[in-house]
Amino acid sequence: MCKKPYYITTPIYYPSTNLHIGNTYTTVAADAIARFKRLTGHEVMFLTGTDEHGQKIERIANEKGITPKEHVDEIVAGIKDLWKMMNISYDKFIRTTDDYHVKAVQEIFKKLYDQGDIYKDSYEGLYCTPCESFWTETQLVNGNCPDCGRPVEKAKEEAYFFKMSKYADRLIQYIEEHPDFIQPESRKNEMLNNFLRPGLQDLCVSRTSFTWGIPVSFDEKHVIYVWIDALSNYITALGYGQENQELYKKFWPADVHLIGKDILRFHTIYWPIMLMALGLELPKQVFGHGWLLVDGGKMSKSKGNVVDPVVLVNMFGADAVRYYLLREIPFGSDGLFNNEIFIKKVNTDLANDLGNLLSRTIAMVYKYFDGVIQAPTCKEAIDDELINLALSTPGKVEASIDALKIPEALESIWTLISRANKYIDETTPWILAKDEEKKERLGTVLYNLLETLRFVSVMISPFLTETSVKINDQLNTKVITWESLKEFNGTVAGDKVVKGDVIFPRIDVEEKLAELEALKPAPVKPANEELVKNPIKEEITIDDFDKIDLRVVKVLECEPVKKAKKLLKLKVDLGGEERQVISGIAQYYKPEELVGKYVVLVANLKPVKLRGELSQGMILAAAPSDDSELVLVNPGEMLTGSQVR
């Protein structure tokens, strides 16, 4: 049977330093989807890799006294070790220093130049080295890069430019005609309204101020800039521009580019326009997931809150980390990573729910039948609910994954696990065992539990890769295909189960929290000068209100919260750091009235979820006791991040 091809990619990561839990989140999510597609009969190409050129790499290498290639080789080795530790099943790992990629990128650049889409000019602007981005004065936030908040440098140099504006209208039309191209929906509106419709400037696509990059083949004092170099990896990895293009013909266009929302603009504007210019098909979908927030904000060395996935895996195991990232983080929205919540989730979902179901079932089969699986010959009506739920769950899981709703898929599986635990309490095998005449019924109950565990094991295999194998070993089952879940009879009567170790031992929460706290990196000086002068205080509760830290913020976006008449969702700029705030001011202000306003934020209030949305602070307002009106505190157009005293 011919398998349907499926092509999924992660971003290629920038190896300036070791990766953190946020990068791991993207790759684990892509791995889970890739594994699921293989399980359900697809021929999968799962691509990841590293974006290894640029001025920042060159500077870091010079500071270390080594070559840029030596530096990236060292970091890439660590990245591959991390992916091995996380059980990432990529099919290809591309490095932009690979010879085949270098040659293909040079050919792409020349083709675009020869057809008039790239031209030479000179450029003078403000450049952010960490982001490798040029900005105009009006785009800066407090004089700093609007993406990362770091200082920019003036740069003037001869450069090649790509005629982005030539394809802008065509791209707008394409996005409007292909509603699934950019997901989630809110990201699509952001790209259209904030970047495309206001008008695109031509894009600088070469540099002469550094040498660590792919040289322009016909003008070697220029190196090809990150956009054409890095973004082209998605097709060069398949053989585009090379003699053997079988993989390209089979897998392109990509089914999904899975990326963080911070690089969405590059993947939904620059990349599709490049493809249009090359006469190639666009990827079917670009999915921009949210950020992984820690301590109420983005991970940052300046805050000392960067989470090292290696530490977590060494302490708790890869499957525990994978489960938390895939189940607890709302895919497509920002999510909170918290050590305490993580450990408690492992204890409740993995140790209590799944682990206890397996250990209790195996123990009872051994206790009552010496480990031998009995045939289900004595069924009762109470069995039907469990069996029907087991048979319907694979379809729910598949629908969720097709819609890239990974937490929903796991929720469906855990609903089945919970039902199986309840089934034990309902059927009371320990009581059945006391009556010799009910041995046949006891054997049927235990068969149903073993078969349910087989269903669970198959369904969790893309997500909890090691745990699935451990369960299969104890069940002693070889029937682990997705097709086998169409019938509730894959467990073989007469086989013998195998006693094994507890798959998820319970964790001492306080002990492990103390260990993790001791391993936290020390904060380094933040880049934002306003926050250096007035650092944000520690998290507070309402009872500690006298410690409150008030900051000036600018409202960037505002929209109603679904099914909540009083709530608005605001995206605000806190001196280079973006936050989401849920505020009960909908009856007093329309969303469009707030965009561009400067308001005051309670900046160190502990993040909470309101109606399922993360709120990272509280907007300050004044109102009479009868709430007849409400007025936001207006700080004037002070610098964002300024402290209100």
Task: For each feature predicted by the language model, list its residue ranges.
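Structured secondary-structure scaffolds
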Residues: 1-48, 100-104, 130, 148, ...
